[in-house]
Amino acid sequence: MFDIGFWELVVIGIVALVVLGPERLPVAIRTASHWIRLIRSTANSVKSELEQELRLQELHNDLKKAEQLQMSNLSPELQESIEQLKAAAQSVTRPYEQQNTIHPAPAAAEVKAEPAQPAAAMTHDEAPMVTTVQSTDVLADKKEEVKP
């Protein structure tokens, strides 16, 4: 890889032994070998992923070419029927697209609300009667639910 011979490795080992000493040299060798293994494994994984992606891309391109060649070699009747099928598929998807679009709200002139009477215009007798009727209906419904 680096074109280093045996004697060159021996010289590097002796220099490392002198610089680091006999106590720290084994730890330094283990650390260096760990980093080298980590770098090699990362490089190999990246290389294999790139090769796999390139193969997939090549297969995809070959498939597109084959599909185009088959479509160009078809008879006019078959090409016409394929166009009709594509048009039918588009017409089927149009109602779903229209259904999923947001339509504007109806105009204010179309929706006519009855004017409400202000609370001050109501007599004293009318207001309590309405609330009393509503509360008795709710109480009657609750009593029926409680009884077995």
Swiss-Prot record:
Subcellular localization: Cell inner membrane
Lipid bilayer topology: Single-pass membrane protein
Domain of life (superkingdom): Bacteria
Subunit organization: The Tat system comprises two distinct complexes: a TatABC complex, containing multiple copies of TatA, TatB and TatC subunits, and a separate TatA complex, containing only TatA subunits. Substrates initially bind to the TatABC complex, which probably triggers association of the separate TatA complex to form the active translocon.
Family as reported in the entry's similarity comment: Belongs to the TatB family.
NCBIfam families associated with the record: tatB
Protein name, entry field: Sec-independent protein translocase protein TatB
Species this protein is from: Aeromonas salmonicida (strain A449)
